[in-house]
Amino acid sequence: MTFKACIAIITALCAMQVICEDDEDYGDLGGCPFLVAENKTGYPTIVACKQDCNGTTETAPNGTRCFSIGDEGLRRMTANLPYDCPLGQCSNGDCIPKETYEVCYRRNWRDKKN
C-alpha cells in the first residue's frame, strides 16, 4: 500500500510540474550561457547580470549571486590565477557589490589538466 501511495504522489508532482511550466516565467531554456568565474571550490558565479544573446538582452534573475567584474574583467584575467573578486547580487540587470570579496579564478577548459 505504501508503494502505491508513493507512486500516486510522484505522479501528482510530475503532473503539477507540467501544468506549471511556462517559458515566460522561467526564461528561454535555449538562451546563451552567462560567463562565469569560479571560487576555490570550483563553484561558478556569473560576472555580469545582463548580456546580449543573438540580438536580445538576457537578464539574470534578481538576487542571483555575481562577481561585479563584468565580462571584460573576466577576459583580462589570466587563467587559473587567483584574484580577489567583489561579490554581489543581481538587481535589475546590474551586479550590486556587497562589500565582500571572494577569491575567484578564470578557468580555461580547453587546457589539458595534468
Curated annotation (Swiss-Prot):
What GO cellular-component annotations does this UniProt entry give? extracellular region
Q: Its Gene Ontology biological processes?
A: negative regulation of chemokine activity
Protein family membership? Belongs to the evasin C8 family.
User: What stretches pass through the bilayer?
Assistant: none
Q: Matching Gene3D superfamilies, A to Z?
A: 2.30.130.100
Which residues are connected by disulfide bridges in this protein? C32-C53, C49-C90, C66-C95, C85-C104
Carbohydrate-modified residues: N39, N54, N62
Superkingdom of this entry's organism? Eukaryota
An example of a GO molecular function for this protein is: C-C chemokine binding
* Taxonomic source organism: Rhipicephalus sanguineus (Brown dog tick)
**Under what name is this protein listed?**
Evasin-1
Q: What does this protein do?
A: Salivary chemokine-binding protein which shows chemokine neutralizing activity and binds to host chemokines CCL3, CCL4 and CCL18. Binds to CCL3 with 1:1 stoichiometry.
Keywords assigned: Disulfide bond, Glycoprotein, Secreted, Signal
Give the domain note: Both the N- and C-termini are required for chemokine-binding.
Describe the protein's quaternary organization and the partners it interacts with. Monomer.
Q: Where in the cell is it found?
A: Secreted
In the record, which residues are listed under signal peptide?
1-20
